[in-house]
Amino acid sequence: MLRRFLPALVVLMVAAAGCGGGSKSNGEAAKTADQVVTDAKAAATSAKAVHVSGSITDAGQPLTLDITIVKDAGGQGTMSESGLKFEIIRVGSKAYIKGSDAFLRKFAGAAGAQLLKGKWLQGSATTGDLAALAPLTDIGKLFNGALGSHGKLENKGETTFKGQKVVAIEDTTQGGTLYVASTGTPYPVAIVGGKDQGTITFDKWNDTMSITAPKGAVDMSKLGSN
Protein backbone atom coordinates (compact mmCIF):
# COMPACT_ATOMS: atom_id res chain seq x y z
CA MET A 1 0.00 0.00 0.00
CA LEU A 2 2.84 2.42 0.76
CA ARG A 3 4.21 1.89 -2.74
CA ARG A 4 0.81 2.78 -4.24
CA PHE A 5 0.17 5.80 -2.07
CA LEU A 6 3.22 7.85 -3.06
CA PRO A 7 2.69 7.61 -6.85
CA ALA A 8 -0.95 8.59 -6.41
CA LEU A 9 0.02 11.67 -4.41
CA VAL A 10 2.77 12.64 -6.84
CA VAL A 11 0.44 12.27 -9.83
CA LEU A 12 -2.00 14.65 -8.20
CA MET A 13 0.75 17.12 -7.37
CA VAL A 14 2.30 16.96 -10.83
CA ALA A 15 -1.10 17.31 -12.44
CA ALA A 16 -1.82 20.37 -10.39
CA ALA A 17 0.86 21.12 -7.91
CA GLY A 18 0.68 26.46 3.61
CA CYS A 19 0.32 29.74 3.44
CA GLY A 20 2.50 32.66 2.38
CA GLY A 21 2.80 35.22 5.10
CA GLY A 22 2.22 38.91 4.54
CA SER A 23 -0.45 40.92 2.73
CA LYS A 24 1.58 42.66 0.02
CA SER A 25 1.36 41.27 -3.51
CA ASN A 26 4.41 39.22 -4.43
CA GLY A 27 3.99 39.67 -8.19
CA GLU A 28 3.30 36.01 -8.95
CA ALA A 29 -0.05 36.78 -10.62
CA ALA A 30 1.75 38.62 -13.42
CA LYS A 31 4.29 35.87 -14.11
CA THR A 32 4.12 32.95 -16.52
CA ALA A 33 2.68 29.71 -15.20
CA ASP A 34 6.04 27.95 -15.42
CA GLN A 35 7.76 30.73 -13.46
CA VAL A 36 5.10 30.58 -10.75
CA VAL A 37 5.66 26.83 -10.34
CA THR A 38 9.43 27.39 -10.28
CA ASP A 39 9.04 30.03 -7.58
CA ALA A 40 6.67 27.83 -5.59
CA LYS A 41 9.09 24.92 -5.70
CA ALA A 42 11.99 27.13 -4.61
CA ALA A 43 9.96 28.53 -1.72
CA ALA A 44 8.75 25.11 -0.62
CA THR A 45 12.12 23.39 -0.71
CA SER A 46 13.67 26.24 1.29
CA ALA A 47 11.07 26.05 4.06
CA LYS A 48 11.95 24.71 7.49
CA ALA A 49 8.66 22.89 8.00
CA VAL A 50 5.24 22.26 6.46
CA HIS A 51 1.98 20.46 7.20
CA VAL A 52 0.50 18.41 4.33
CA SER A 53 -3.05 17.07 4.50
CA GLY A 54 -5.96 16.03 2.34
CA SER A 55 -7.44 13.18 0.37
CA ILE A 56 -7.39 11.82 -3.17
CA THR A 57 -8.90 8.89 -5.02
CA ASP A 58 -6.63 6.31 -6.64
CA ALA A 59 -8.22 3.61 -8.79
CA GLY A 60 -11.49 4.28 -7.02
CA GLN A 61 -9.96 3.89 -3.57
CA PRO A 62 -9.94 6.82 -1.10
CA LEU A 63 -6.49 7.79 0.14
CA THR A 64 -5.93 10.29 2.95
CA LEU A 65 -2.89 11.77 4.63
CA ASP A 66 -2.00 14.20 7.39
CA ILE A 67 1.75 14.66 7.70
CA THR A 68 4.09 17.16 9.33
CA ILE A 69 7.53 17.49 7.73
CA VAL A 70 10.60 19.16 9.25
CA LYS A 71 13.53 19.92 6.97
CA ASP A 72 16.67 17.85 7.61
CA ALA A 73 14.90 16.01 10.43
CA GLY A 74 12.04 13.87 9.11
CA GLY A 75 8.30 13.72 9.31
CA GLN A 76 5.37 12.11 11.05
CA GLY A 77 1.65 11.72 10.60
CA THR A 78 -1.13 9.39 9.54
CA MET A 79 -2.22 7.84 6.26
CA SER A 80 -5.05 5.55 5.24
CA GLU A 81 -6.46 3.67 2.29
CA SER A 82 -10.00 2.32 2.23
CA GLY A 83 -10.25 2.54 6.00
CA LEU A 84 -6.88 0.90 6.66
CA LYS A 85 -5.11 3.47 8.82
CA PHE A 86 -1.48 3.63 9.85
CA GLU A 87 0.87 6.09 11.53
CA ILE A 88 4.28 6.90 10.09
CA ILE A 89 7.44 8.53 11.41
CA ARG A 90 10.80 9.11 9.78
CA VAL A 91 13.79 10.33 11.74
CA GLY A 92 16.92 10.56 9.63
CA SER A 93 17.57 7.24 7.90
CA LYS A 94 15.10 5.27 10.05
CA ALA A 95 11.40 4.89 9.32
CA TYR A 96 8.64 3.67 11.60
CA ILE A 97 5.09 2.49 11.01
CA LYS A 98 2.24 1.49 13.34
CA GLY A 99 -0.87 0.04 11.78
CA SER A 100 -4.44 -0.07 12.97
CA ASP A 101 -5.94 -3.46 13.85
CA ALA A 102 -7.56 -3.67 10.41
CA PHE A 103 -4.28 -2.76 8.71
CA LEU A 104 -2.36 -5.43 10.62
CA ARG A 105 -4.95 -8.14 9.98
CA LYS A 106 -4.79 -7.48 6.24
CA PHE A 107 -1.02 -7.44 5.92
CA ALA A 108 0.12 -9.67 8.78
CA GLY A 109 -2.80 -12.05 9.26
CA ALA A 110 -4.70 -12.70 12.48
CA ALA A 111 -1.74 -14.13 14.38
CA GLY A 112 0.62 -11.39 13.22
CA ALA A 113 -1.92 -8.71 14.04
CA GLN A 114 -2.22 -10.00 17.59
CA LEU A 115 1.56 -10.05 17.98
CA LEU A 116 2.11 -6.55 16.56
CA LYS A 117 -0.97 -4.85 17.99
CA GLY A 118 -0.10 -1.36 19.24
CA LYS A 119 3.57 -1.71 18.33
CA TRP A 120 5.79 0.40 16.13
CA LEU A 121 7.79 -1.34 13.41
CA GLN A 122 11.21 0.02 12.49
CA GLY A 123 13.00 -0.23 9.17
CA SER A 124 15.30 1.61 6.79
CA ALA A 125 14.01 4.80 5.18
CA THR A 126 16.28 4.25 2.18
CA THR A 127 15.78 0.57 1.31
CA GLY A 128 13.12 -2.06 1.85
CA ASP A 129 9.39 -1.83 2.46
CA LEU A 130 9.46 1.54 4.24
CA ALA A 131 11.60 3.37 1.67
CA ALA A 132 8.43 4.77 0.08
CA LEU A 133 7.95 6.88 3.20
CA ALA A 134 11.08 8.94 2.55
CA PRO A 135 9.70 11.17 -0.25
CA LEU A 136 6.58 11.84 1.81
CA THR A 137 8.58 12.95 4.85
CA ASP A 138 11.30 14.99 3.15
CA ILE A 139 10.47 18.53 2.00
CA GLY A 140 13.10 18.59 -0.73
CA LYS A 141 12.24 15.19 -2.19
CA LEU A 142 8.50 15.78 -2.01
CA PHE A 143 8.40 19.11 -3.81
CA ASN A 144 11.31 18.55 -6.20
CA GLY A 145 9.76 15.29 -7.33
CA ALA A 146 6.21 16.55 -7.49
CA LEU A 147 6.85 19.92 -9.12
CA GLY A 148 9.76 18.85 -11.26
CA SER A 149 7.63 17.62 -14.18
CA HIS A 150 4.18 18.49 -15.44
CA GLY A 151 2.08 19.06 -18.52
CA LYS A 152 1.33 22.35 -20.23
CA LEU A 153 0.58 25.02 -17.64
CA GLU A 154 -1.65 28.07 -17.80
CA ASN A 155 -1.79 30.98 -15.37
CA LYS A 156 -5.50 31.53 -14.68
CA GLY A 157 -4.88 34.66 -12.63
CA GLU A 158 -5.45 35.68 -9.05
CA THR A 159 -8.30 34.24 -7.00
CA THR A 160 -8.88 33.09 -3.43
CA PHE A 161 -8.68 29.70 -1.76
CA LYS A 162 -10.41 29.47 1.61
CA GLY A 163 -10.06 33.21 2.02
CA GLN A 164 -6.39 33.41 1.02
CA LYS A 165 -5.24 35.29 -2.08
CA VAL A 166 -3.64 32.89 -4.52
CA VAL A 167 -2.59 32.45 -8.14
CA ALA A 168 -4.29 29.54 -9.91
CA ILE A 169 -2.03 27.47 -12.16
CA GLU A 170 -3.90 24.94 -14.28
CA ASP A 171 -2.32 21.90 -15.88
CA THR A 172 -4.18 21.81 -19.18
CA THR A 173 -2.61 18.47 -20.13
CA GLN A 174 -3.31 16.30 -17.10
CA GLY A 175 -5.90 18.44 -15.36
CA GLY A 176 -5.84 19.87 -11.87
CA THR A 177 -4.99 23.24 -10.38
CA LEU A 178 -2.13 24.37 -8.18
CA TYR A 179 -2.83 27.35 -5.93
CA VAL A 180 0.19 29.46 -4.98
CA ALA A 181 0.16 32.31 -2.46
CA SER A 182 0.00 35.66 -4.28
CA THR A 183 1.04 37.63 -1.18
CA GLY A 184 4.14 37.15 0.90
CA THR A 185 6.30 34.13 0.08
CA PRO A 186 4.89 32.16 -2.89
CA TYR A 187 4.34 28.88 -1.06
CA PRO A 188 2.08 26.20 -2.56
CA VAL A 189 -1.30 26.49 -0.82
CA ALA A 190 -3.34 23.66 -2.31
CA ILE A 191 -3.82 21.23 -5.16
CA VAL A 192 -7.33 20.53 -6.38
CA GLY A 193 -8.59 18.03 -8.93
CA GLY A 194 -6.47 16.32 -11.53
CA LYS A 195 -6.48 12.69 -12.59
CA ASP A 196 -6.77 11.60 -8.98
CA GLN A 197 -9.68 13.70 -7.76
CA GLY A 198 -9.21 15.31 -4.40
CA THR A 199 -7.59 18.17 -2.53
CA ILE A 200 -4.19 18.41 -0.87
CA THR A 201 -3.40 21.47 1.24
CA PHE A 202 -0.12 22.87 2.53
CA ASP A 203 0.03 25.08 5.61
CA LYS A 204 1.96 25.87 8.81
CA TRP A 205 4.99 26.80 6.74
CA ASN A 206 8.07 27.27 8.96
CA ASP A 207 6.16 26.60 12.18
CA THR A 208 8.25 25.21 15.02
CA MET A 209 7.74 21.45 14.97
CA SER A 210 9.64 18.45 16.31
CA ILE A 211 9.89 14.84 15.16
CA THR A 212 10.60 12.15 17.76
CA ALA A 213 11.39 8.49 17.18
CA PRO A 214 9.07 6.09 19.04
CA LYS A 215 10.51 3.98 21.83
CA GLY A 216 10.50 0.20 21.80
CA ALA A 217 10.03 -0.22 18.05
CA VAL A 218 10.27 -3.74 16.61
CA ASP A 219 13.03 -4.20 14.03
CA MET A 220 11.33 -5.43 10.86
CA SER A 221 14.48 -7.20 9.69
CA LYS A 222 14.22 -9.57 12.65
CA LEU A 223 10.59 -10.53 12.14
CA GLY A 224 10.24 -14.13 11.07
CA SER A 225 13.98 -14.75 11.40
CA ASN A 226 13.55 -17.41 14.03
Walk through the language-model features, giving the residues of each.
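Subset-of-secretome marker
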Residues: 2-6, 20-226
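Sec-dependent signal peptide hydrophobic core
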Residues: 5-13
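C-terminal motif of bacterial Sec signal peptides marking the signal peptidase cleavage site
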Residues: 15-18
